[in-house]
């Protein structure tokens, strides 16, 4: 837990949860939600897994850049892709995540080192550690 909270995001869900609407207090996110076709829905809106994937990809990418920066290494046109899956987990549902890390022009072993360290400091990784499977895949 942080010693000091620097920023708090706030989002409100209305309607029917996964088939509803979500808005952030600053109105930057204002989305209709829909259950994916693969789960029996219409797939006509976004869903919690897409939003989680977007947040995790951005957060991990920032952590990766911080870690590399500490070693005075520029990551250039790096990308982090978060793949978030959902499926039955006993009598509930669970998530699985794969983070695909691509840093053109940097040795794969060095990227792996940075990714492993970023996984230790990324707030999303810290929040999910021990709760869901997170695979780091370095291209």
Say what each PLM segment does.
Residues 1-54, 61-139:
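Extended beta-strand/beta-hairpin segments
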């Amino acid at each position: 837990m942080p010693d000091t909270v620097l920023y708090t995001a706030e989002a409100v869900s209305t309607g029917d949860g996964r088939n509803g609407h979500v808005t952030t207090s600053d109105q930057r996110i204002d989305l209709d939600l829909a259950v994916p076709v693969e789960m029996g829905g219409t797939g006509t809106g976004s869903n919690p897994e897409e939003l989680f994937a977007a947040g995790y990809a951005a957060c991990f990418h920032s952590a990766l850049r911080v870690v590399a920066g500490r070693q005075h290494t520029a990551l250039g046109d790096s990308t982090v892709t978060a793949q978030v899956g959902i499926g039955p987990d006993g009598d509930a549902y669970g998530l699985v995540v794969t983070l695909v890390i691509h840093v053109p022009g940097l040795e794969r072993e060095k990227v792996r080192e940075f990714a492993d360290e970023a996984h230790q400091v990324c707030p999303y990784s810290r929040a999910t550690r021990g709760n869901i499977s997170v695979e780091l895949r370095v291209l």
